[in-house]
Amino acid sequence: MNKKRFVAFTMTAMMGLSLFAGCSDNTKKENGNNSTTSTEQETTNNPSASTTDNAYGLRDNTKDGAILHCFAWSFKTITESMEDIAMAGFSTIQTSPVNACYDGGDAGMELFGAGKWYYHYQPTDWKIGNYQLGTKEEFKEMCETAHKYGIKVLVDVAPNHTTKVTEAISEDLINAVGGLDKLYHSKGMNAIGNYNDRTECTLQGVGGLYDVNTEDPNFQNYYIEYLNDVIACGADGFRYDTAKHIGLPDDPQDNPSLPNNFWERVTTEVTNADKLFMYGECLQDGGERLADYIDVIGATTASSYGQFMRGAISTSSMLADTVTNLRIGQAAPNVVTWIESHDNYTGDDKTYQALDNDKVVRAWSILAAREVGTPLFFARPYGATAENMWGTFNKIGMAGDNLYKDPIVVASNRFRNAMVGLKENVFNPEDTQNVLFIERGTKGLYIFNNSKSAYEMNLATNLENGTYVDRVGGNSYTVADGKITGSIAGKQIVILYNDGYVDLSAPATVKVQDGTQGNFIGDSTTVTLVADNATKATYSIDGGEEVEFKNGDTITIGENLDFSEMTTVTLRGENAAGNKTCISYIFKKQDPIKEGTKIYFVKPDGWADRVCAYVYDESSSSEVQVNASWPGVEMTIEADGTYCYTFTEEWINPLVIFTDGSNQSNGAMEPGAAVIADKIYEVE
């Protein structure tokens, strides 16, 4: 494998929901390029949609609001962030998988490196709690806290597969299905070769993992018991990872006596089935049968729409007809939309490089303003950049970047919450294709000028006559005699509405100074603290006493830590209205690998005699540090037959892959092992 970096691949599948309701008013103004859409259900008893469901303006139904994907956040972190999430206008959170999972890589807690975020998606059992996210009790507390704020909880589930390390599968699961051989389809350990072949797509393994026999009633019973436990703890729905790899009723059967009834059972035989919000991940890269999965689950993802939006936001054009096209063919428009998913971010799409934060925010605002679809916002790792996709801390369990609290994201979410039940009218003015208008009934108007030049408005609108405040910039715009006038600067977003506006004070911000690194070398490190719009700000270390601080104060941490130990700094703040914010940072005291350090490798039977060590570090630098181009540096053979590699310079956070050119020590597309001085490595 000739590659310098090893990007994790994971599947993500989403499961059904029953989506959007909209008004049936067919009147529209002729404003040039016009695309009016409505969903399959109609709402006629809510002409203003001015009443939201709680003090934060959040919606009681997940389908009506916006979802925040708390990617690799721990249950405790989500609990502490709940008021931040509510203030940002998200009505629903989505967790990473909460089931027991594979603890490879020495159970490391880095997103990528000495730890692997995608072990979330390698189940070893279907019971609540894992080493990455937290305990069942912490999950239950998280759900209870969410409900206090009016926030719903979606849980990512992955019943399609398990880890390929069968020794890690729990005895309870093996016994429940009658033996390990009965856990998988007959060819479940074979990789899919043709995704358009439904036999392969539904009965063979995806992403190097083993395909579970989801038609087996013993497995179904065990899995449904897990779902009901998750629901009892407070979950309000599920996202089904790799949904298109679980058979539909008319798909090929592995065992003629076992019908493809998985979807029927998990959508009807769970507690509160009619109240759950569920959707399935059906990536549009072959064999997806989108309409059929929407029919049996309730809703799916719309990955091709996200791909289009990522391209569109990078141009100046923003055609209404293309923006409203969900790219799902004739399927019902019951979809979860996104600008990027965690697969787009971590996989071949490399959206961390293709889209900067400004583009993510602007594109998101369009999804949130629309009536059709339920938008999901992926929370990128904290401090992530195009040069450093895993961020400045690279830790599983930490909250993601503060981008989900960006003022445009917040304004767009609150607009969405206020406009529930109002039909969308999406159009371009006659004189430009670079400006997008989204009217919501007669009560709200979203405008995005995607060009670099200002746009002077003087055009007809369905918006009622009156003066409207732009909830992004604060300026006022007037509608008189059915026309709106005013100027919109290049790349500016304007969100106009009065009815349903929830007036919340600006939140406090507490954080560490931008650029602060989570891993440090030396006896200690000094951290600069930031507090903005906070009447009170405190820090605590590892759950200790809270100490007040002011903007710019510094603290020193790490003096009493051993190398590789971690410490958590928690910052709390409060604004004048009493709204609270909280964020925790996980720091690790790093022991550098010094020049002259040796590591060893036991060559497996069947490998060639020439073995190389490929060492790399991509944890924080703008460029990946490597010891040599692939396959690395040839190792020397010791007297006892083990292979040895000696470091010729100091490294901060290196990983290593051993290879003979045809075989390698880590799995395909998995990161290397953390380097530990004098360790003897063996292939698992």
Question: Where on the chain are the PLM-derived regions?
Answer:
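Sec-dependent signal peptide cleavage junction
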Residues: 19-42, 47
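Active-site-proximal helices and loops of the catalytic beta/alpha 8
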Residues: 46-64, 80-86, 99-102, 106-121, ...
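Low-complexity, disordered linker/stalk regions enriched in Pro/Thr/Ser/Gly
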Residues: 503-592
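Aromatic-rich carbohydrate-binding modules that target alpha-glucans
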Residues: 546-554, 604-650, 662-671
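Sec-dependent N-terminal signal peptides of Gram-positive bacterial secreted proteins and lipoproteins
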Residues: 5-25
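Substrate-binding cleft of carbohydrate-active enzyme catalytic domains
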Residues: 131-167, 227
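Aromatic- and acidic-residue-enriched carbohydrate-binding clefts of CAZyme catalytic domains
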Residues: 50, 61-65, 101-144, 177-211
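Short proline/glycine-enriched turn/loop motifs at strand-loop junctions of beta-rich domains
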Residues: 371, 452-453, 461-466, 530-537, ...
